[in-house]
Regions:
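Hinge/beta->alpha junction and helix N-cap segments in small-molecule ligand-binding domains
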Residues: 31-44, 60-70, 92-93, 115, ...
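Immediate post-signal peptide segment of exported/extracytoplasmic ligand-binding proteins
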Residues: 20-28, 144-147
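Bacterial N-terminal signal peptides
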Residues: 8-18
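Extracellular/periplasmic ligand-binding modules, especially the Venus flytrap/periplasmic-binding
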Residues: 217-225, 265-281
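Flexible loop/hinge segments that line or gate small-molecule binding clefts
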Residues: 93-131, 135, 139-142, 149, ...
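Hinge/cleft segment of the Venus flytrap/periplasmic-binding protein
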Residues: 24-26, 160-161, 172-174, 271-316
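Hydrophobic alpha-helical
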Residues: 76-79, 84-104, 169, 184, ...
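Bacterial N-terminal signal peptides that target proteins for export
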Residues: 1-9
Length: 316
């Protein structure tokens, strides 16, 4: 069970309480799906905007390299270290549920980023993924004039973030554009650009007419762009991503990618850190929550005529 709200992200929404008056050192684990990705780096930078002001807070970052099994082991390690809170981006929402339950049963707050586990926990700060996919479907449909063939480059199984983005996209196409046909959908393992290149090449070979492609994250959208450009068909295909990383925004400005559902990951990380701080100020977690408090951030359609509205300092 979860209770959720969608908001246009403003950092005044949560004012973090200070822990500096307390004598103990607070250890906070950061466990994304992979260290070194634009979004996971931006989340960490956003969190440090909050944590660096607190001399009693220490952040421990671990890299499971996109492996749910490794991530479960690292959760066990953070629990054994007696972390006070863990900020988690689960590789698999089901596979990490047992780890989250164990952490919170031992009094450790868990805040997830982008994907909530099936196990209820303190909070989850997410892009509104269904809304993001719907937004992409709506805007792509306008760009291709409500008709044509489109394809989807999907997320790995178990990644509810990608599943929800695809769900929203399909809902928009079905509701708004009866003249659009989804001609293919394939999973890009590991969300990787090189896998998306291979999938896009297969779409191009199978479809002499292809008008749009939705890749459920920006890395994969960039892979689709590379393949379409190499085939000499980029001008005919509207390629969309989701997340809003800086490299994709640059390609939108160049006219090579049609758009992305943008999320300010710096601010998202900052908000997650403020939730952690407020939770720790209450003392150790007394009991496992019955529901997850889900904060969903409204996406922004970054296209060539709107991308300039995103300030440089908010590009990650």
């Amino acid at each position: 069970m979860a209770k959720s709200k969608i908001l246009a992200l403003t950092l005044c929404a949560v004012a973090a309480l200070s822990l500096s008056a307390q004598s103990k050192t607070f250890k906070i684990g950061y466990l994304p799906t992979s260290i070194g990705q634009p979004n996971t780096n931006a989340w960490q930078a956003g969190m440090m905007r909050v944590f660096s002001k607190e001399p009693t807070v220490k952040l421990v970052a671990l890299d499971p390299q996109l492996s749910a099994q490794t991530q479960v082991g690292m959760m066990d390690d953070l629990i054994s270290q007696r972390c006070d809170a863990i900020v988690l981006q689960p590789v698999d929402a089901a596979a990490l549920s047992g780890s989250v339950r164990r952490a919170e049963s031992e009094g450790i707050y868990v805040v997830t980023l982008n994907t909530a586990t099936l196990q209820p926990h303190t909070a989850s700060v997410q892009m509104a993924d269904i809304a993001a996919g719907y937004l992409v479907g709506e805007e792509m449909g306008k760009q291709i004039h409500g008709r044509g063939n489109v394809a989807i480059i999907e997320s790995p199984p178990g990644a509810t973030l990608g599943v929800n983005r695809e769900k929203g996209f399909r809902e928009a196409v079905a509701k708004l554009y009866p003249g659009i046909t989804i001609v293919g959908a394939q999973v890009a393992e590991g969300w990787k650009k090189e896998n998306a290149i291979t999938i896009m090449n297969s779409f191009l070979q199978a479809n002499s007419e292809l008008d749009g492609v939705f890749a459920v994250n920006d890395n994969m959208a960039e892979g689709a762009m590379i393949a379409a450009e190499s085939a000499g068909r980029l001008a005919q295909i509207k390629i969309w991503g989701a997340n809003g990383q800086k490299s994709t925004l640059d390609l939108i400005e160049q006219g090579k990618i049609a758009g992305t559902a943008y999320n300010n990951c710096f601010a998202q990380g900052e908000l997650a850190a403020k939730i952690v701080m407020d939770s720790l100020a209450k003392g150790r977690l007394a009991s496992i929550p019955a529901t997850t408090d889900i904060i969903q951030i409204k996406p922004f359609a970054a296209m060539k005529d709107t991308v300039s509205q995103i300030p440089q300092q908010d590009r990650w």
